[in-house]
Amino acid sequence: MKLSDIGEFGFIDRIKKDTIVNPASVVVGIGDDGAVYKTTEGKEQVAVIDTMIEGRHFIIGKTATWYEAGYKAVASNLSDIAAMGAEPTHLVLSVALTPQMDAAQTDELYRGMKDICRHYGVNILGGDTVVSSEGAVLTVAAFGEIEAGKAVLRSGAVPGDIVAVSHTLGNSGAGLDVLLAGEAGYAALKKAHAMPVPQVELGRLAVKYGCHSLNDISDGLASESNEIAAASHVDLILDKLQIPLSDELRRWCEVSGKDPYAYALTGGEDYELVLTMAPDDFYLLKEEFSALTAIGRVQAGSGKVYLKDGHHTQVLAPSGWNHFSGGE
């Protein structure tokens, strides 16, 4: 059955089930001109938005399934919420689909969205559905809450801070190359690209332990660290050899001849967090969240990032994914 067979309202009826996972905060959900939800006294609201385009951000049957596309469209937004230190609460979405798309495929698309929302306690409040002449376009706007005055910005880094990142970097970019090459194996790299994990828990802990600046690694460490340096008017000194890499990434690079650090610095879509904080606070945070690696320090400066490789240090340019230049 195609979408053209069931129509817009049939489609809405088909997907609106199981969209509310936290009903106590919802006054009006799907079915009216707008959604109404309750806010929490003493909290501020965080809003983010992202778009994924079929053929540009995902290729069905090659780099993603419909389930994975739906999951990732939400995950990228929850990562932005996490990068502010906030707790995600609600989202709305706009989906452009072709009339020829099979209804079972839309079921999978929304199953991916609903599964990740259920995991993080996020309500789908509604949205918009339109016809696309060529490929799907998925736009998600997510909302979160954080204690008033506690949002962690890119602009808070201060000299003396430790620079740290979560988990390992470069897996998603490598996973994309593995998928495009049609390589067997490398399951962890493929999953890192298709179904990234937004670091919501770490974002909340960063607030608890007084993190000074925070950014999610969506475009690559080179880009995100430069954003912190520029916004904070400081310099970041990163140690290349301290950047955490997974064993599977190293194996892929041995086979493919690629540079694992290039994936970490410019690969993008890892959706890990890079943060800066006072050393004492960092070690307290690390006791509660062990998957953190110190990779550098903050010093007084003019907004540059330097990459140290043994005895050699060079300026690290803000290269990474750029939507309008089409790459680095």
Description of each model-found segment:
Residues 10, 17, 21-165:
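Glycine-rich phosphate/pyrophosphate-binding loop regions near the starts of catalytic domains
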Residues 49-51, 56, 135-137, 151-204:
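Short, acidic (Asp/Glu-rich) active-site segment that either coordinates a divalent metal cofactor
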Residues 56-60, 175-177, 316-319, 327:
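A short, polar/proline- and glycine-enriched secondary-structure boundary/capping micro-motif
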Residues 117, 144-147, 167-173, 180-183, ...:
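Short, well-ordered alpha-helical segments in soluble proteins
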